[in-house]
Curated annotation (Swiss-Prot):
Alphabetized UniProt keyword annotations: Cytoplasm, Proteasome
Gene3D superfamilies in alphabetical order: Glutamine Phosphoribosylpyrophosphate, subunit 1, domain 1
Name assigned to this protein: Proteasome subunit alpha
Name of the gene this protein is made from: prcA
Record keyword Cytoplasm present: yes
Function: Component of the proteasome core, a large protease complex with broad specificity involved in protein degradation.
Entry GO terms, CC: cytoplasm; proteasome core complex, alpha-subunit complex
Location relative to the cell: Cytoplasm
Family: Belongs to the peptidase T1A family.
Length: 258
C-alpha cells in the first residue's frame, strides 16, 4: 500500500516563500524614494513598453518587481478599484493606504490559499495635495501580504543588499530631483556582480524607467521623465551612464501620465 504524500504546514509555507523570493530576485531592481517635491521612481528596465512604474490614481503611484503578468493584473485591479471608489464617493476618498491594504489582502489570500504564490513585490506611493504640508508615504507590500510603510526609500527586486547599503551612505531627506536621480542610479549601479568588475557597471539611460509624483501639481501628480530629460539630469549630476552630453539645464516636459 502506497502511503499518501505528506508535508507539514511549515514546510509548505517555507517552500512557497523560497519560490516567491527566488522569482523576485531574478528580476531587475527598482528604487522608490522621497525627494523635496514628492516621490521618485527609478527602475532598471530596458523595455520601452512593459512598465514597472505607473500611475494608480491622482496622487498615487505604483512600482513592482517580479513576474510581469502577475503584477500587471494587480495594477489593473488597483486602478479599477480606485476609479470605482472615486466615482461613487469623492476623488479625495481614494487613498494610498486603502489601496495598499487591498493589495496586502489579495496577496496574503493567494499566498495562504493557493498552491503557487504570486512572485511579486509592490510599492504604493502617495503624496498629498498642493495645499497640504509636504508629506509622502511609501507602502511596501510583500508576496505574502506583509505591509510596511516607509518615509525615505524602498528597494525591491534583484540583489537588494548593495543597493540598500549605497542608499544608506548617500541618501538624505530633502534632496532635489537631480540629486535624487543621481543617488538612485548610483545605488542601482552598485548591484553589479561581486569581484573586479563590480565598480565598472553602468546603467545607460535606455535601461532606466523614471517617473515622479510631484505634490505641487494641481490634480494628477504622476508624470514620466523622458529619456532626454533624464540624460540631462544624470549628466548635470555627474553620473556616468556612457551616453552623456554636457548640458545641465533641465526642464521636464509636460506629458500626460500613463
Amino acid at each position: 500500500m502506497t502511503l499518501p504524500y505528506y508535508a507539514s504546514a511549515e514546510q509548505i509555507m517555507r517552500d512557497k516563500t523560497e519560490l516567491a523570493r527566488k522569482g523576485i530576485a531574478r528580476g531587475r531592481s527598482v528604487v522608490v524614494l522621497t525627494y523635496d517635491k514628492g516621490v521618485l521612481f527609478v527602475a532598471e528596465n530596458p523595455s520601452a513598453t512593459l512598465h514597472k512604474v505607473s500611475e494608480l490614481y491622482d496622487r498615487i503611484g505604483f512600482a513592482a518587481v517580479g513576474k510581469y503578468n502577475e503584477f500587471e493584473s494587480l495594477r489593473r485591479g488597483g486602478i479599477l478599484q480606485a476609479d470605482l471608489r472615486g466615482y461613487q464617493y469623492d476623488r479625495r476618498d481614494v487613498t494610498g493606504r486603502a489601496l495598499a491594504n487591498a493589495y496586502a489582502q489579495a496577496l496574503g489570500t493567494v499566498f495562504n490559499d493557493q498552491l503557487k504564490p504570486f512572485e511579486v513585490e509592490i510599492c504604493v506611493a502617495e503624496v498629498g495635495y498642493p495645499e497640504q504640508s509636504p508629506e509622502a508615504v511609501l507602502y511596501r507590500i510583500n508576496f505574502d501580504g506583509a505591509i510596511v510603510d516607509e518615509r525615505e526609500f524602498v528597494v525591491m527586486g534583484g540583489t537588494t543588499e548593495p543597493i540598500v547599503a549605497a542608499l544608506k551612505d548617500s541618501y538624505q531627506p530633502g534632496l532635489d530631483l537631480s540629486s535624487a536621480v543621481g543617488v538612485a542610479v548610483q545605488a542601482l549601479q552598485a548591484s553589479g556582480p561581486e569581484g573586479a568588475d563590480k565598480e565598472k557597471r553602468t546603467i545607460g539611460v535606455s535601461q532606466l524607467e523614471v517617473a515622479t509624483l510631484e505634490q505641487a501639481r494641481p490634480r494628477r501628480a504622476f508624470r514620466r521623465v523622458t529619456k532626454t530629460a533624464l540624460e540631462q539630469l544624470l549628466v548635470g549630476n555627474g553620473v556616468d551612464t556612457s551616453v552623456g552630453k554636457a548640458t545641465t539645464t533641465v526642464e521636464l516636459p509636460e506629458e500626460p501620465a500613463e
